[in-house]
Amino acid sequence: MANVVVVGAQWGDEGKGKVVDIYTEHADDVVRYQGGNNAGHTLVVGEEKVVLHLIPSGILHEGKRCIIGNGVVLDPEVFIQEITRLKDKGRLKDDRALLVSESIHIIMPYHKRIDIAREAKSGEKKIGTTGRGIGPTYEDKIGRRGIRLMDLLDRDVFARKLKENLEEKNVILEKLLGDKPFTFEEIYEQYCGYADILRNYVADTSLILYNDSKAGKKLLFEGAQGTLLDVDHGTYPFVTSSSTCAGGACTGTGVSPRDIHEIIGISKAYVTRVGSGPFPTELLDADGEKLRQVGHEFGATTGRPRRCGWFDAMVVRYAVRVNGLTGVALTKLDVLNDFETIKVCTGYTFEGKPLADLPANLAVFEKCEPVYEELPGWMSDISGARTFEELPEKAKSYVKRLEQLIGCPIVLVSIGPRRDQTIIISNPFQDKV
């Protein structure tokens, strides 16, 4: 038995969806544990491209149970839209193959309006929110004002909580943000309609996962975003609002830490970031644009162009430490095919002095200078390789050097968007990483 957590080891968009899709073959349950529809997973199945924002990637596999845990925040409208699209494609034939925690917090229309209005008023201090209402929903969760799915299913409880929230939210919208308020009626009936559909998917998911793990079933936990976007361990305040690190898999599902056996971090062979915040290896030249175009670096959720830079070993080494990574899956190695020289950041300096680790102080992080090591490129198409030995020597040397720098074994190498364009060195469900 092995229960595996998959986390992003950089600033998100590392290719977790593809890796989760591959690992799903070996799992019984696939579980989302944090975030919301602010993150997109892009999967390529045969000739079919599927983008999911809420539903776990495992939904494309027959016979797997997909679970959305209590640590996620749920937009009912988006959730229902994804279900409809999947059913239109002939997927999700059994509704009970997809379960949602009864304790999950619900994204309300006022959350989205507040999110957008705040960002509009931020000027140069923009965080880079997707405007999906994720942050304000987590605020209400922590402030104990949130509306959970179990509340939504009880019309009387929902009505009371909605009225209480609107008294406060309308003041914020009108007086502080200069936006229009909501009426009770326009939200209540719409969300009661959502509740009638959601009722088919509600469950005590923590208990289900406990029983499945106890019975020897294999659990796969699918993280969203990345380590450097974690609300506690990321580049605060340029972070998301949830726990993206491996610890979030426990708090976001109700699964015991003792029931987590392997933790795999996903990292691109270079690095990208969306939105504002420090990014020491960012490339603002032709190399950065080349990475963006060849790697199709545009957000699955927002369509925004991603900032691109050379691989940052400091970032991934930090992810190894705070997550307790047992292995790293390296994605998009093929994007580097046509670079004669590839740079790798091995460390930072601040005011001329080397730093031992990532600085927590944002003002320091923004002024860090990367220390680079240059490696020769392989200048050939590697997308046809199916074993590590089939890669060009210079490509193998690049992977091995990254492994040395991050202090963690690389267990998978992705060399293209398709599932078969993957080199599995070690499988966390079958091998001891």
UniProtKB/Swiss-Prot annotation:
Binds 1 Mg(2+) ion per subunit. It is found in: Cytoplasm. One of its GO terms (molecular function) is GTP binding. Its EC number is 6.3.4.4. It catalyses: IMP + L-aspartate + GTP = N(6)-(1,2-dicarboxyethyl)-AMP + GDP + phosphate + 2 H(+). Keywords: Cytoplasm, GTP-binding, Ligase, Magnesium, Metal-binding, Nucleotide-binding, Purine biosynthesis. Its cofactor is Mg(2+). IMP binds at residues 13-16, 38-41, 130, 144, 225, 240, 304. The active site is at 13 (proton acceptor), 41 (proton donor). Substrate binds at residues 300-306. Mg(2+) binds at residues 13, 40. One of its GO terms (cellular component) is cytoplasm. PROSITE patterns: ADENYLOSUCCIN_SYN_1, ADENYLOSUCCIN_SYN_2. GTP binds at residues 12-18, 40-42, 306, 332-334, 414-416. One of its GO terms (biological process) is IMP metabolic process. Its main location: cytoplasm. Pathway: Purine metabolism; AMP biosynthesis via de novo pathway; AMP from IMP: step 1/2. Disulfide bonds: none annotated. CDD domains: AdSS (cd03108). Belongs to the adenylosuccinate synthetase family. Plays an important role in the de novo pathway of purine nucleotide biosynthesis. Catalyzes the first committed step in the biosynthesis of AMP from IMP. Homodimer. This is Adenylosuccinate synthetase. The lineage of its organism: Bacteria, Pseudomonadati, Thermodesulfobacteriota, Desulfuromonadia, Geobacterales.
